[in-house]
């Protein structure tokens, strides 16, 4: 199934989280937090400004992004977990 985000929304796949700490301690599943990093899989056409013009998004497909911990809506597509979020929920693009 394919999905095309609308307006200023993005489809983001969370990056896998670390299984161990820097000191080598293995983190159990019950103690793990959802990562706030992901890769942009699809982007909408952009936001419509007050003047009626479409403003392109700053992020593009393939960008690695840092997003708000509680931002976005969890969705499951073809057995994989994704987030649909607004561009405003993106805190930065990782380079």
Swiss-Prot record:
Top-rank lineage group of the source organism: Bacteria
Subcellular location as annotated: Cytoplasm
Alphabetic keyword roster: Chaperone, Cytoplasm
Gene Ontology biological process: chaperone cofactor-dependent protein refolding
UniProt cross-references to Pfam families, sorted A to Z: Cpn10
Record function comment: Together with the chaperonin GroEL, plays an essential role in assisting protein folding. The GroEL-GroES system forms a nano-cage that allows encapsulation of the non-native substrate proteins and provides a physical environment optimized to promote and accelerate protein folding. GroES binds to the apical surface of the GroEL ring, thereby capping the opening of the GroEL channel.
Subunit record text: Heptamer of 7 subunits arranged in a ring. Interacts with the chaperonin GroEL.
Similarity remark: Belongs to the GroES chaperonin family.
NCBIfam families given in the database record: PRK00364.1-2 (NF001527), PRK00364.1-5 (NF001529), PRK00364.2-2 (NF001531), PRK00364.2-4 (NF001533), PRK00364.2-5 (NF001534)
The protein, known as: Co-chaperonin GroES
Species per Swiss-Prot/TrEMBL record: Desulfotalea psychrophila (strain LSv54 / DSM 12343)
Gene that produces this protein: groES
């Amino acid at each position: 199934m394919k999905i095309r985000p609308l307006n200023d929304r993005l489809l983001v796949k969370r990056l896998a989280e670390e299984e161990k700490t820097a000191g080598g301690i293995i983190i159990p599943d019950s103690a793990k937090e959802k990562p706030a990093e992901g890769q942009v899989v699809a982007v909408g056409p952009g936001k419509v400004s007050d003047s009626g013009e479409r403003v392109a998004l700053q992020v593009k497909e393939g960008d690695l992004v840092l997003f708000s911990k509680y931002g976005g809506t969890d969705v499951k597509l073809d057995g994989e977990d994704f987030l649909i979020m607004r561009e405003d929920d993106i805190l930065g693009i990782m380079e």
